[in-house]
UniProtKB/Swiss-Prot annotation:
Protein name: UPF0328 protein ECU08_2060
Top-rank taxon: Eukaryota
Family: Belongs to the UPF0328 family.
Amino acid sequence: MSVTNIPQSHETNEMQHIKNQSHWRVILSSLGIFMATVYPIFMYLVFTKDCFEERHLLRLITLLLPFLYSTIQYLFLLYTNWKNGHKQEDILYNILYYLLNLLLTTFSIISILSIIALIINRRENDDDLFFFSVILPSMPLTYLLSTSCRLVPGQIGFIDTGINIFIDILILSCLVSLTLICIEPKDYLCFIAISSALTLVRLLKKKYLSSKQSPPPTAPWRVAIFVLIFSFVVFIYVLAACGSITALDYHFHLFDKVKSILS
C-alpha cells in the first residue's frame, strides 16, 4: 500500500463512522420521541386499569422497556461525548470531561441494575410507586437531555431557541410536579398528558418551523437551565438507584452479608 492511500483510508473510515453515528442518532431520536410521548400514557393505562391488574408479565415488560431505552441512550451519549471531547491542558476542562462521562456511565449502570431488580423482585406493591416517581419522569428527561442540551465540555449548555425554551421549561415543570407532589395515581394522568402533548408540540415545531439560529450554549442562563435539567436527571436516577438497591437487598440480603463480613 502506498503512503498516499493511508490518509484516504483514514478519511473513508471517518466518513463511515460519521454516517453510522448519524444513523444511530436518527434511530434513538425516533425511539426517544415514542418513549416521551405515547409510551407514558400507555404505561399509565397499564398500571391503573383493572383489566391489566393480573397481567404481571405485561406490567413487568412495560417497566423494563424505559430502562432499556435509557441504558442505550446514555451509552450513546457517553460514546458521542467521548469521541467529540478532546484532552486539553486545562485541568478544570479535563475534570468536567471525565466527571460528565462518569455520570453518563452511572446512569446506564443504574438503568441496568433497575432492569435486574425489576426482574428478580416479586413485591408488586412497589411497582406503582416506582413507576410514578421514577420511570415516568425519566423518559421525557432522557429525551430532553439528549435533544436540548450539549454535553461536550467547553460547550456545555442548553441549546434550544425561541418558543422551544418555554416548552422545555413547561415539560420540566410537569416532571418536577409529577415526582414531588403527593397526589393519587389517578391524578397523574393530567401531568402525563400535558408533558406528552408539550413534547409532541416541540417535535412538530422543530420539524416544520425549525430555527436557523445557532446560539452559544455557554451563555450563563443557558448553562443554568442545563444544570437544572441535569440536576433533576441526577435526582431521578438517585431514586432509581435506591429502589434498585432496596429490591436487590430484599432478594439477596446484601446488607446483612456486608454486616457479617465487617463484624
